[in-house]
Amino acid sequence: MNKGELVDAVMAKATVTKKQADAFILALDIVA
């Protein structure tokens, strides 16, 4: 795995995590 692939993998994971966080916050807003 070269550096570019590693960066891509980290960015992809960060994007998924942010989407999950946004969805979680949205769900809290709906419940509240």
Curated annotation (Swiss-Prot):
GO biological process: chromosome condensation
MF-aspect GO terms: DNA binding
Signal peptide: none
Function: Histone-like DNA-binding protein which is capable of wrapping DNA to stabilize it, and thus to prevent its denaturation under extreme environmental conditions.
Other known facts: The heterogeneity suggests that there are probably two distinct DNA-binding proteins, as in E.coli.
Family statement: Belongs to the bacterial histone-like protein family.
DNA-binding in keyword set: yes
Keywords per UniProt: DNA condensation, DNA-binding
UniProt name for this protein: DNA-binding protein HU
Underlying gene: hup
